């Protein structure tokens, strides 16, 4: 009877160990919040031959330099309308030459606007071996060899999961499943509403070390760097050379699909030599440009003199307006402190989304594996080694250490901002510190419970062997419970930070 209870307890604990080894181990290595923030960033080089941006986007003959447009695309001086808001329209824009970048990053700024609550069909960003000037896949050709990032506006499969951003790769032999929105072919996806936003929507697509990452700026703020995580695909192989492109299409419903800019950067890993610059211009061209610059400079100086003569009352500025007052300086310091807190919370939220996305994939794969083993191999015994258990314990210690570092950093930031606003008040800092202490105690309790389970089920004179896998329970599993506790803890920390910020912002008006 005791042996049966011990085997059942080990079988329930084993999925927890597997999940911790997969997700928390990766968390500590640096892919999540616990990563080293001082990791060197790749070198970025702007590639103008694979980019466009207004104003003066088109030439006198209506073409875009280094790009070819087809279908119903309409270039203008400040943007390219890839597909207008008319029924059954298709358009695309592609680079004329192939790019041969090992790692790259593109930043696309666009608008999708329409009258109705629902729009169609959508917009796609491409990296493909050949140009797909026209076709049925969002205005581009099917059977492409490369990757497409689809901003799908219309819900063809009726599952109410649109607008959505979907990453689909193809080797040139697979037809796109348009009726099901490519659900069975998607490598990764996220649901984001990119239609009718007050500011342009921005997409940052990075292909670095065989990993494709999509970040989205949802267009609610004018901040160009306010990106949030959307999707990531690891171990992705794409053609060594390919064309960048954008396409769009409309159906029975129609939206305007406008692309304001497409900026391409070549990435070079740290430690490697950056790409050699292009051939320098000749001396004759340099002299020509220098003469033009001097001519424009003289015209500018002349215009300045004319303006000063015509507006003598605007010359000069009172001395007291040049320097900021004590109140202005304190207000600026308060705003800067709040802005730093906002940026840190936003960065934590972005990294939390990436961690949750990875954990979601790990839990789903783990659940499928357990179901397969339980259904197909009911008599086979698993085995867990001492090394795996030690790895779990070390991982827990490392996570606790990093949570403590995060707590100290955020507590110090809150203390400084509260001190600037109310030097004599320490109640807000004490309350925040007390909340962090409570969170730390809860984490220690969870760690102690897991250690007790490990020690209780590990006799010193025998190696641990896992018994048969029990039938998959219908109630809440241990893995889902741990994930729920972790998510709830992180959300609680975020709520405390947000409430402290709101209280501090409210106090300064009294």
Swiss-Prot record:
Domain L-type lectin-like: 44-267
GO CC annotations, alphabetized: collagen-containing extracellular matrix; COPII-coated ER to Golgi transport vesicle; endoplasmic reticulum; endoplasmic reticulum membrane; endoplasmic reticulum-Golgi intermediate compartment; endoplasmic reticulum-Golgi intermediate compartment membrane; ER to Golgi transport vesicle membrane; extracellular exosome
Binding annotation for a carbohydrate: 88, 121, 156, 178, 251-253
Sequence motif ER export motif, residues: 509-510
Chief location: endoplasmic reticulum
Membrane disposition: Single-pass type I membrane protein; Single-pass membrane protein
Modification(s) after translation: The N-terminal may be partly blocked.
Keyword Plastid set for record: no
Cytoplasmic side: 499-510
Annotated transmembrane regions: 478-498
UniProt subunit comment: Exists both as a covalent disulfide-linked homohexamer, and a complex of three disulfide-linked dimers non-covalently kept together. Interacts with MCFD2. May interact with TMEM115. Interacts with RAB3GAP1 and RAB3GAP2. Interacts with UBXN6. Interacts with SERPINA1/alpha1-antitrypsin. Interacts with BET1.
Disorder named in the UniProt entry: Factor V and factor VIII combined deficiency 1: A blood coagulation disorder characterized by bleeding symptoms similar to those in hemophilia or parahemophilia, that are caused by single deficiency of FV or FVIII, respectively. The most common symptoms are epistaxis, menorrhagia, and excessive bleeding during or after trauma. Plasma levels of coagulation factors V and VIII are in the range of 5 to 30% of normal.
Functional note: Mannose-specific lectin. May recognize sugar residues of glycoproteins, glycolipids, or glycosylphosphatidyl inositol anchors and may be involved in the sorting or recycling of proteins, lipids, or both. The LMAN1-MCFD2 complex forms a specific cargo receptor for the ER-to-Golgi transport of selected proteins.
The protein's name in its UniProt record: Protein ERGIC-53
């Amino acid at each position: 009877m005791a042996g049966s209870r011990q085997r059942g307890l080990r079988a329930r604990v084993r999925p927890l160990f597997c999940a911790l080894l997969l997700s928390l181990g990766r968390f500590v290595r640096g892919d999540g919040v616990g990563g080293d923030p001082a990791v060197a960033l790749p070198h970025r080089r702007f590639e103008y031959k694979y980019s466009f941006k207004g104003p003066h986007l088109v030439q006198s003959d209506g073409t875009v330099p280094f790009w070819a447009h087809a279908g119903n695309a309409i270039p203008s001086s400040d943007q390219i309308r890839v597909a207008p808001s008319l029924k059954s329209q298709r358009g695309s824009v592609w680079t004329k030459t192939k790019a041969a970048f090992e790692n790259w990053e593109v930043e696309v700024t666009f608008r999708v606007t329409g009258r109705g609550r629902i729009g169609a069909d959508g917009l796609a960003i491409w990296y493909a071996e050949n140009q797909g000037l026209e076709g049925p896949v969002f205005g581009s050709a099917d059977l492409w060899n490369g990757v497409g990032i689809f901003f799908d506006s219309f819900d063809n499969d009726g599952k109410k999961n649109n607008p959505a951003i979907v990453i689909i790769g193809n080797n040139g032999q697979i037809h796109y499943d348009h009726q099901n929105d490519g659900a069975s072919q998607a490598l990764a996806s996220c649901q984001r509403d990119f239609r009718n936003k007050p500011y342009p929507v921005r997409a940052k697509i990075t292909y670095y070390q065989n990993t494709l990452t999509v970040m989205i700026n949802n267009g609610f703020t004018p901040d160009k760097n306010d990106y949030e995580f959307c999707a990531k695909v690891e171990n992705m192989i794409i053609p060594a050379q390919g064309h960048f492109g954008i396409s769009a299409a409309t159906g029975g419903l129609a939206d305007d699909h406008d692309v304001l800019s497409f900026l391409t950067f070549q990435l070079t890993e740290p430690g490697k030599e950056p790409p050699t610059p292009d051939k320098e211009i000749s001396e004759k061209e340099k002299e020509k440009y220098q003469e033009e610059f001097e001519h424009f400079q003289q015209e500018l100086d002349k215009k300045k003199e004319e303006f000063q003569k015509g507006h003598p009352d605007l010359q000069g500025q009172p001395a007291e307006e040049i320097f900021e007052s004590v109140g202005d300086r304190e207000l600026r310091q308060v705003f800067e402190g709040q802005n730093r807190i906002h940026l840190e919370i936003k960065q934590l939220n972005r990294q939390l989304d990436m961690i949750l996305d990875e954990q979601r994939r790990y839990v789903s794969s783990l659940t499928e594996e357990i179901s397969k083993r339980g259904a197909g191999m009911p008599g086979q015994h698993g085995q867990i080694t001492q090394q795996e258990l030690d790895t779990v314990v070390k991982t827990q210690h490392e996570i606790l250490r990093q949570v403590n570092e995060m707590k100290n950093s955020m507590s110090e930031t809150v203390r400084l901002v509260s001190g600037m606003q109310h030097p004599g008040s320490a109640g807000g800092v004490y309350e925040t510190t007390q909340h962090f202490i409570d969170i730390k105690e809860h984490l220690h309790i969870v760690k102690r419970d897991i250690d007790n389970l490990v020690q209780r089920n590990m006799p010193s004179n025998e190696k641990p062997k896992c018994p048969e896998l029990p039938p998959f329970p219908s109630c809440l599993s241990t893995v889902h419970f741990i994930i729920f506790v972790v998510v709830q803890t992180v959300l609680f920390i975020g709520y405390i930070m947000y409430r402290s910020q709101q209280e501090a912002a409210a106090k300064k008006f009294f």
